Amino acid sequence: NEVKFRGITQINRLILFGGEPFLNTQLFEYIIKEFSKFTTILKIETVTNGTVLNNNVKKIIDNFQPYLTISLDGPEFIHYKLRGKGSHRKTTKFIHYLKTINYTNFEIASTYTRLHQLHSLSRDDIFQYFTNMDVHFNINDVFSKNKVLVVKEMEKSLVDRKKFITDSINNIVENNEKAFISPILYDVLISMIYKSTNHTFCDDIDPSNTITFDVDGSKKLCFRFWGTHNSSKAELFNNKEYFQQCKDCWCKGMCLECVANIIDGYSSVINEDGQFIECHKPELMEYCIKEIIYLSQDQSKISKLVNNFKRFIRYA
């Protein structure tokens, strides 16, 4: 009723979360059909653990072709420690099913934690694990204040991050579309190729772009604020003009930063009190641009970078 009242006739992305959304396929289907009565839905997305695979789930996949983000944290033993015994087998079975029906509309989301480090699993090990699986994937450090989970020395060195950018450019040029590319390069290319400008840190919490509903029907800023978790600081912290360093920054139009991470104290750029810490994005974005300029000396390679990039645009 809220969406209908606002006169919305097109939904660019309908994103359905859980818990585990596929535990209630009837509700999943009901929401889509109700919205379809008065809107055009361009894309349906969901985040799943991939632990439920029955005829109802298969029907959902077949009928609605949702973009699936599947949670898998690495090899069997580490995934079991994080998500429970038996979960890895179910999730890999789910992925195998998608491959057997040639369903390519999915990616793996992996969370890198301190437990990975304690069991001698580096990010490169996890990267190689998913590369060997031949799937689209992304790897993110855990957001947690639990010292058992939080990654020691979470930030890569600037040298490593620059190498990651160079490797990412090569992967795009070579069309290795299942490779995970640098988020910094991603933001730069989105801005340069599609001529977009990010006026705020996060468009997802802008009510003119996005409406988020909790399970009880109440409106929230984004899914990170479901339940009782909310903050009056969100609108303030989403304003780049509020921070002097950001206000005067040459690359602020390309910059994205998760406001929920800032509020929850997980951002390495701005703390939960709104105090600026440090930011290496200007240096890294400048490096991206220099690498792109260098690449432009080869017309074939720069054309491949621009034309292939659309295949690397992911759920975020």
Identify the residue ranges that each predicted region occupies.
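Exposed loop/turn and edge beta-strand positions of beta-sandwich/beta-sheet ligand-binding modules
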Residues: 10-12, 207, 245
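Short capping micro-motif at the N-terminus of alpha-helices
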Residues: 55, 221-222
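Flexible mid-to-C-terminal extensions adjoining Fe-S/redox cofactors in radical SAM and related proteins
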Residues: 218, 224-316
